[in-house]
């Protein structure tokens, strides 16, 4: 029964997050995109800032491959739709699922004897610093990058 309740909360959070990611205008970085709860664990909240950053990074990866083949409108073009969802909607769902998985796995690392060592954290921090210095301020602003978000992404 606990699992069904947890799954329902995750589904609801995903739907709310998906609607939030698809909104117009700027992103409220501090707004909550996803809240995950269960009976035996504390709530996990994911901000819109991080969700937007993760989506933008994935978008950039797709653009580098698909835009030259399918044109700039492939994100919203219904001729590429699958299961009634265009590419943009599918990727938003995928990003939110990936973020949920990332946070849940991180939350349960100790259950499986997995840890991120100080060496690992130092390497992640160094890689994030490199990411921030390798990209222009305009590019970082476009994807909503902060060093904190890059570290989170590299942790997953």
Regions found by a protein language model. Give the residues of each.
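Bacterial N-terminal signal peptides that target proteins for export
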Residues: 2-10
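Bacterial N-terminal signal peptides
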Residues: 11-18
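C-terminal motif of bacterial Sec signal peptides marking the signal peptidase cleavage site
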Residues: 20-23
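N-terminal targeting/tethering segments
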Residues: 27-145
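Long, compositionally biased
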Residues: 149-151
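Conserved small/polar residues in nucleotide/adenosyl-binding loops
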Residues: 154-155
